[in-house]
Amino acid sequence: MADNQIPSSVADAVLVKSIEMPEGSQKVEELDFNKFKGRPITVDDLLQGMKHMGFQASSMCEAVRIINEMRAYRDPTTSEKTTIFLGYTSNLISSGLRGTLRYLVQHKHVSAIVTTAGGIEEDFIKCLGDTYMSSFSAVGADLRSKGLNRIGNLVVPNSNYCAFEDWVVPILDKMLEEQEASRGTENEINWTPSKVIHRLGKEINDERSVYYWAWKNDIPVFCPALTDGSLGDMLYFHTFKASPKQLRIDIVEDIRKINTIAVRAKRAGMIILGGGIVKHHIANACLMRNGAESAVYINTAQEFDGSDAGARPDEAVSWGKIKVGADAVKVYMEATAAFPFIVANTFAKEDGL
């Protein structure tokens, strides 16, 4: 072999011949800001420019497409729309994304909601006191000595939770009174988590609240883990205050209610921000109808640990929670960074905002 020739074994290893790409293969496209010179750049400009960028930019644009198709559907016989289940974790209500979630509920863009206890109480607490920016590296012991509770790079003064107790306990008293007065009557009151949230949404009477709008628009809000947070603390304290009488909250009636909504849906769509109970509760309801027709997951969890949060949509297909052949995507992004862009190009776009 001549010194000026590449060894054949090296050439065979490195210079592998490519096949012809199939007809219609999408090329990677670049976002060229020169195209927007001399005019304002819109959200639509950005999303269209990111569509074929690759990685999570393309996944986010796929989420936009799926949600827009979700919203455009009409049953050919009844003209019924897609039943859209929205799920989100409590930290998103603590963050400024709360306003985006409130917008969806205020304008009746979703059919039902599932969240955690924190996702309920933090909404009401933010009507009673402010949440502040902090730092992910703020020292826990220092914050504890100052009565400040950290949520990522946010802090909530402990006094906000005291204000929440002052507000919610009299309502719990009234609910117990109504429950006891109805015993043995034809209209006996059976409180459920969704009924409790509905009542609190009415009582807060504040347009900044997500659940005020859920009450006003009669959008059911489910919280199977209602006791897992400050609201649970208040219910615990109330058991002593009210003893021997006890407020009863029935989770069985609520599981029947959410599953029935899924079963009766002409078409079901899931938009789930975060993971855990909010993700699985919606997916499991859709199992009752052999799966949702479309799904958008937005979270940063990985699947290698077998967690519910990390699971991709295809895992839900294996369980019958998303239909075979359904339109689904998982966007591996933190929801506060991704969801405002998605809403701007879906729900808010129709509203002309």
UniProtKB/Swiss-Prot annotation:
Active-site residues annotated for this sequence: 321
Keyword Magnesium: no
Residues annotated to bind spermidine: 121-122, 233, 280, 306-308, 315-321
Pfam families: DS (PF01916)
InterPro entries tied to this protein: Deoxyhypusine_synthase, Deoxyhypusine_synthase_sf, DHS-like_NAD/FAD-binding_dom
Enzyme Commission number(s) of this protein: 2.5.1.46
GO molecular function: deoxyhypusine synthase activity
Catalysed reactions, semicolon-separated: [eIF5A protein]-L-lysine + spermidine = [eIF5A protein]-deoxyhypusine + propane-1,3-diamine
The protein's required cofactors: NAD(+)
The keyword Transferase is assigned to this record: yes
Signal peptide: none
Pathway the protein takes part in: Protein modification; eIF5A hypusination
GO cellular component terms attached to this protein's record: cytoplasm
GO terms under biological process: spermidine metabolic process
Binding site for NAD(+): 90-94, 116-118, 122, 228, 275, 300-301, 334-335
Record key words, sorted: Hypusine biosynthesis, NAD, Transferase
Family recorded in the similarity comment: Belongs to the deoxyhypusine synthase family.
Subunit structure and binding partners: Homotetramer.
UniProt xrefs under PANTHER family: DEOXYHYPUSINE SYNTHASE (PTHR11703:SF0)
Function summary: Catalyzes the NAD-dependent oxidative cleavage of spermidine and the subsequent transfer of the butylamine moiety of spermidine to the epsilon-amino group of a specific lysine residue of the eIF-5A precursor protein to form the intermediate deoxyhypusine residue.
Record protein name field: Deoxyhypusine synthase
Gene name in the database record: dys-1
